[in-house]
């Protein structure tokens, strides 16, 4: 077991009195086990020192804390720590240093695997899931880290963040390596990049899906959001950058890549610099087909996925697999066997009833893409059930209302994690993008889904957008159990979706 003095030697020179074995690192006091080191970071609203008492009670063997203004351990906490023999060690710039510290503790696991990081406004979850499905084989396993959890495609442990904290990232990578992973597909959010959660991860390939409007409540503006995303493509040692050249930001990153990183662009629009192109896209009820043209050859591709945006995701997956050395014929064969990702354009059907699609679309671009997809794949009227999250970017709400007015035939407005915000104000913001539309409002989300499913015809399609895989509805400070997927199954009157 590594000792604390050895662990921190590149950054701090500890005294013998502070030295002790390190059982693990934890940012969340609830994850502390006896002998773990509690890491107290400064946050945008709170400092981890607020949970110092909980960490000491759980058996923390030492505490690393990040200086921030006048924030410091309270006198009574210092006394309690001293009595327990627990050193409180101030580490300047700990937020930036935690990733490399954790990597050192857990044996630098990403150096022993090939890690693919996927970032972008929309498509991160789908691309990582599809890539892991394509790569994962019994003798050559591919791990997953992302919104749906961590593990392997057939066995995920639920998580709380798209990208976990820096200590958890390294601990998870070490676990996946022990379990046989030779490669890992990881979602990398803008928050994670801004907060240095993937510092210390040695990425082999970085993928950009697109850049649209999201998380402006955190980043302030689109420029700040873009700057955070771009950091993934400047990490030391990055070998490949897989970039969507149909996206303006993708082209910008392509032109700014540092030497030593090879660019592999992909395009559905025939961009001349794209090494992976999709041509002749056809959308059918059972999925999509196109011709894949690459620097490694050409081949027809079929995939059981819905939407032109999923065609772009297929290109991203193919390009990432090519960057890892997977042969084109193998890629084509495995794309045909992809399984839908829970809550990502996931179809539910029952004979004689409308088709229902559950999708996570919660940005204007994603909602437009999902609506365009169901319009292309189905012949009947397009129904839409959606709302917008509370205490988040208000500016996107009228844009989503505008998308609904343009692309849906029938719309039912409902709640989608209103949190502490007045749900009526959220609905009013959405309506600003669709003046004159008298859409029904059913605040109860299950009731709204049932309303649409009961009124839609058997040739129609109902898109339930916004929550996807989520299993709670956030109302006020409460997280109440709720699943769009389960509500759809109940509305269709069957036990499971197709």
Curated annotation (Swiss-Prot):
Location(s), subcellular: Cytoplasm
Cofactor: Mg(2+)
EC number(s) reported in the record: 6.3.2.13
UniProt function note: Catalyzes the addition of meso-diaminopimelic acid to the nucleotide precursor UDP-N-acetylmuramoyl-L-alanyl-D-glutamate (UMAG) in the biosynthesis of bacterial cell-wall peptidoglycan.
Residues holding UDP-N-acetyl-alpha-D-muramoyl-L-alanyl-D-glutamate: 29, 162-163, 189, 195, 197
Binding site for meso-2,6-diaminopimelate: 392, 416-419, 466, 470
Catalysis performed (reactions): UDP-N-acetyl-alpha-D-muramoyl-L-alanyl-D-glutamate + meso-2,6-diaminopimelate + ATP = UDP-N-acetyl-alpha-D-muramoyl-L-alanyl-gamma-D-glutamyl-meso-2,6-diaminopimelate + ADP + phosphate + H(+)
UniProt cross-references to PANTHER family, sorted A to Z: MUR LIGASE FAMILY MEMBER, UDP-N-ACETYLMURAMOYL-L-ALANYL-D-GLUTAMATE--2,6-DIAMINOPIMELATE LIGASE MURE HOMOLOG, CHLOROPLASTIC
GO molecular function terms noted in the UniProt entry: ATP binding; magnesium ion binding; UDP-N-acetylmuramoylalanyl-D-glutamate-2,6-diaminopimelate ligase activity
Cited InterPro entries: Mur-like_cat_sf, Mur_ligase_C, Mur_ligase_C_dom_sf, Mur_ligase_cen, Mur_ligase_N, MurE/MurF_N, UDP-N-AcMur-Glu-dNH2Pim_ligase
Binding site for ATP: 120-126
Metabolic or biological pathway: Cell wall biogenesis; peptidoglycan biosynthesis
Family: Belongs to the MurCDEF family. MurE subfamily.
Name this protein carries in UniProt: UDP-N-acetylmuramoyl-L-alanyl-D-glutamate--2,6-diaminopimelate ligase
